Amino acid sequence: MTFSQKTDTDVLLIGAGIMSATLGTLLHALEPSLRLTMLERLDDCGLESSMGWNNAGTGHAANCELNYTPQRADGSVDISKALQVNTQFDISRELWSHLVTTGAIPDPRAFLHPCPHMSFVWGEENVAFLKARHAAMAAHHCYHGMDYSEDPAQIAQWAPLVMEGRDPAQKIAATRIITGTDVDYGALTHLLVGHLKTAGLDLRYNSEVIAIDRGDDGIWTVTFEDTVDGTRQQITAGFVFIGAGGAAIELLQKSGIPEAKGYAGFPVSGIWLRCDVDAVAARHHAKVYGKAASGSPPMSVPHLDTRVIGGKTSLLFGPYAGFSTKFLKRGSLTDLFGSITASNILPLLDVAKDNAALEEYLIGQVFQSRHHQFEMLRQFFPQARRADWQEAVAGQRVQIIKPDQGDPGGQLEFGTELVAASDKSLVALLGASPGASTAAAIAVHVLQTCFADRLTEDGWLPALRGALPSYGIDLITDAEACSASRKATAKVLKIDNIDA
């Protein structure tokens, strides 16, 4: 990838959420002279899925999320996906530590707080699963220090609200690791964008992209409209990153690149229950994840969480999944229909045919009564009072429907994926899970995909290792490097660590 002074900007970031902010931050660290421009359709950064109350704020390290550790037919548990997510979060920790050390982020407490991560289950079958899961995870250095208990008294010390009022005859089990975190990704986005703005970022709010065109010279021309007065402008760029959350699929389609053919989006909405009562929130300090219902999407795993947003501690429970045809929380009900094309209609229909259990689950969630929703909370918090809780709408999650290779059908993917132009001059990030926690790892993937020629010893590599000391090291297999990374980042970020 080479840049030209013929363009208005070197790098154009579409969307002002955590993904664009992280990629922009990393690019600036590697080459401060790069001209960066960011376009955002709303009037501030981080207002969609990055905003504090639009996501769970879990520093997803696959400590407690049971959907990352499926059980095999023989009863053993596969932790390979969990290890991948776990070490991807280490990359985020290293980048944040670098930003704190260099003064770009003055205080990590502005967005990050230590918070134990727990898994909690009930019933003989689920207890057996959690015990097998703990045995597999605790044996690996990445999960050193993870505790397991079936003792109600011990679990009550870890999470008193979960145990008070619970049937003493109920078979229960929990795991706990103290190295977990609660992250306000909205606050982090503001910190990153503010840092980039100080460094020269051309930031344009109220700017909605309406066209993305590539010229014969390979230069991209992006047309955007002022959402306040309706005026239109154009900007040329050598490299375009589409990090617009749920809207990324539509923007990718506007680019016209052949690689986008067949891709579609499947939106899933969510609702939280939120408690701002100080006396209640003060008695729960953990993120407690349970087991998802059969057929439910990964982001629907129920959990009772400590949240710290704007300096205030609250509790969150959910999410309750739902369906909306919007691709963004502040989007349009026509988003899904407008994204249907001749190339993706067959993959969409194929996915609809093959995912009856998911569709049945979502329909059930949509028509679920408030009483039923609250009873679900009481499975985690038996003595919860209805008056203490209010509903809050989560950000939209748009899952990937991708074409089958050599087949007109499609498949539903619960994850994230980069779709890049053949010349690597444009790339879009699709998908939703695990999302913000792996933003730094995704940014590194963008570098490897689109800027491989610059990742050399006389190019960006020295600066990249300065920002991410573990770059090029497999923390899953290198226990010593993993321990060293976590010890160093825990100290800088003021979070808990367990020495190996």
Curated annotation (Swiss-Prot):
GO molecular function, one term: L-malate dehydrogenase (quinone) activity
Domain of life: Bacteria
Reactions accelerated catalytically: (S)-malate + a quinone = a quinol + oxaloacetate
Cysteine pairings via disulfide bonds: none
Enzyme class per UniProt: oxidoreductase
Keywords: FAD, Flavoprotein, Oxidoreductase, Tricarboxylic acid cycle
Pathway the protein contributes to: Carbohydrate metabolism; tricarboxylic acid cycle; oxaloacetate from (S)-malate (quinone route): step 1/1
Cofactor(s) recorded in Swiss-Prot or TrEMBL: FAD
GO BP annotations, alphabetical order: tricarboxylic acid cycle
EC number assigned by the record: 1.1.5.4
Annotated InterPro entries: FAD/NAD-bd_sf, MQO
NCBIfam families: mal_quin_oxido, PRK05257.1-1, PRK05257.1-4, PRK05257.2-1, PRK05257.2-4, PRK05257.3-2, PRK13339.1
UniProt xrefs under HAMAP family: MQO (MF_00212)
Protein family: Belongs to the MQO family.
Full protein name: Probable malate:quinone oxidoreductase
Gene designation: mqo
